[in-house]
């Protein structure tokens, strides 16, 4: 990580442990923050006292663009006018942890030249997590502050340049990074980048040119785990397998001059003669999905999905919807008239009239299926060889704006099994309470042996 480079400045064993533990805690915290939005930044200069110790590198802190400008302004105004920007394609603080030799294996470090530069630099600053937006505008910011255009250089062109301490210069050195196990391993690439940094700095030092250098990346090379990793403890997470989040595919969109019909389902499965096929991956997120036959107008719409081959034939699914005005509610309502499955010249019809709602809304239902155990919203008048199940089904064919669904009218009725259970339980408890209250109010004093008109009962005490 970024902080691992600072560790190299501490040579004695007595000072190693506390600093190492502090920096490793920064690694754990930065790994828990959304790393796809932050990259590390290392700054060092040949001038002294350009940066005060950073007080904001506490747990979870991310350096914003405004904070970064407060760190850079003193160096650009008071420091050397020659600025080097080592810009890597990908870099994360985890790279410094994995390949920086922070556990004492200094001979295996892939950042030996960078660590040596930080050791010898009179001024340095390490920011483990900088906001991606701040880094994306860093080159433009440096250009405005220095008043010099960025010059892309390599080792060959750098040796030919004659830098002047009084004239501003912004030198941009691009460093590659390969995170895959392709032609080169990440350690080899990082080591090669570190050698480039060492050669560039050696060239400047040989010419006795003062400079300020920065190392950062365009984007992170790794994606950190969830923030819950810190709250739950790192120890238990080390051997656990990270569960991949399910991919969210975009809805099917039928367009003529604008998006007209939107259709989405988390799972789209069809069966013919009890042989099931999952059409989800063939339907959503597919650029060349066959929508031939689809059409739309203000009162009628049809979404036609054609697959070939499917069950050994060309199969077309047609979702037919209509929008009508109802005077009672004084608004337009849409209804899915039917669902048709065309195959080998035959047509299977399903009645889907329960798929309905105001035309300004979309329709959503957890299950739209021909199976009885999943609601049977797809109803056929005659026995059919076809079955269909749509999980988390959503459709909108009228008043579509852009590629997003409107507010959804859900199929869940008010008197669901859970609601019935709650109502019956409440009524039963209310009956018990009413009966108990009635019994309490019906209590009477025991006056059976108390005759107020008769003689007084006298009890003689016998000793």
From Swiss-Prot:
<feature type="glycosylation site" description="N-linked (GlcNAc...) asparagine">
    <location>
        <position position="351"/>
    </location>
</feature>
<dbReference type="GO" id="GO:0030672">
    <property type="term" value="C:synaptic vesicle membrane"/>
</dbReference>
<feature type="propeptide">
    <location>
        <begin position="33"/>
        <end position="225"/>
    </location>
</feature>
<protein>
    <recommendedName>
        <fullName>V-type proton ATPase subunit S1</fullName>
    </recommendedName>
</protein>
<dbReference type="GO" id="GO:0036295">
    <property type="term" value="P:cellular response to increased oxygen levels"/>
</dbReference>
<feature type="signal peptide">
    <location>
        <begin position="1"/>
        <end position="32"/>
    </location>
</feature>
<feature type="glycosylation site" description="N-linked (GlcNAc...) asparagine">
    <location>
        <position position="297"/>
    </location>
</feature>
<feature type="glycosylation site" description="N-linked (GlcNAc...) asparagine">
    <location>
        <position position="267"/>
    </location>
</feature>
<feature type="glycosylation site" description="N-linked (GlcNAc...) asparagine">
    <location>
        <position position="399"/>
    </location>
</feature>
<feature type="transmembrane region" description="Helical">
    <location>
        <begin position="413"/>
        <end position="433"/>
    </location>
</feature>
<keyword id="KW-0406">Ion transport</keyword>
<feature type="glycosylation site" description="N-linked (GlcNAc...) asparagine">
    <location>
        <position position="344"/>
    </location>
</feature>
<keyword id="KW-0812">Transmembrane</keyword>
<keyword id="KW-0472">Membrane</keyword>
<dbReference type="InterPro" id="IPR008388">
    <property type="entry name" value="Ac45_acc_su"/>
</dbReference>
<dbReference type="GO" id="GO:0030665">
    <property type="term" value="C:clathrin-coated vesicle membrane"/>
</dbReference>
<feature type="site" description="Cleavage; by furin">
    <location>
        <begin position="225"/>
        <end position="226"/>
    </location>
</feature>
<keyword id="KW-0968">Cytoplasmic vesicle</keyword>
<dbReference type="GO" id="GO:0016020">
    <property type="term" value="C:membrane"/>
</dbReference>
<dbReference type="GO" id="GO:0031267">
    <property type="term" value="F:small GTPase binding"/>
</dbReference>
<keyword id="KW-0375">Hydrogen ion transport</keyword>
<dbReference type="GO" id="GO:0036035">
    <property type="term" value="P:osteoclast development"/>
</dbReference>
<keyword id="KW-0813">Transport</keyword>
<keyword id="KW-1133">Transmembrane helix</keyword>
<feature type="glycosylation site" description="N-linked (GlcNAc...) asparagine">
    <location>
        <position position="164"/>
    </location>
</feature>
<dbReference type="InterPro" id="IPR046756">
    <property type="entry name" value="VAS1/VOA1_TM"/>
</dbReference>
<feature type="glycosylation site" description="N-linked (GlcNAc...) asparagine">
    <location>
        <position position="255"/>
    </location>
</feature>
<dbReference type="GO" id="GO:0005789">
    <property type="term" value="C:endoplasmic reticulum membrane"/>
</dbReference>
<keyword id="KW-0325">Glycoprotein</keyword>
<dbReference type="Pfam" id="PF05827">
    <property type="entry name" value="VAS1_LD"/>
</dbReference>
<dbReference type="GO" id="GO:0033176">
    <property type="term" value="C:proton-transporting V-type ATPase complex"/>
</dbReference>
<feature type="topological domain" description="Lumenal">
    <location>
        <begin position="33"/>
        <end position="412"/>
    </location>
</feature>
<dbReference type="GO" id="GO:0097401">
    <property type="term" value="P:synaptic vesicle lumen acidification"/>
</dbReference>
<dbReference type="GO" id="GO:0141109">
    <property type="term" value="F:transporter activator activity"/>
</dbReference>
<comment type="subunit">
    <text>Accessory component of the multisubunit proton-transporting vacuolar (V)-ATPase protein pump. Interacts (via N-terminus) with ATP6AP2 (via N-terminus). Interacts with RNASEK. Interacts with TMEM106B (via C-terminus).</text>
</comment>
<comment type="function">
    <text>Accessory subunit of the proton-transporting vacuolar (V)-ATPase protein pump, which is required for luminal acidification of secretory vesicles. Guides the V-type ATPase into specialized subcellular compartments, such as neuroendocrine regulated secretory vesicles or the ruffled border of the osteoclast, thereby regulating its activity. Involved in membrane trafficking and Ca(2+)-dependent membrane fusion. May play a role in the assembly of the V-type ATPase complex.</text>
</comment>
<feature type="topological domain" description="Cytoplasmic">
    <location>
        <begin position="434"/>
        <end position="463"/>
    </location>
</feature>
<keyword id="KW-0256">Endoplasmic reticulum</keyword>
<dbReference type="GO" id="GO:0033116">
    <property type="term" value="C:endoplasmic reticulum-Golgi intermediate compartment membrane"/>
</dbReference>
<feature type="glycosylation site" description="N-linked (GlcNAc...) asparagine">
    <location>
        <position position="290"/>
    </location>
</feature>
<dbReference type="InterPro" id="IPR046755">
    <property type="entry name" value="VAS1_LD"/>
</dbReference>
<keyword id="KW-0770">Synapse</keyword>
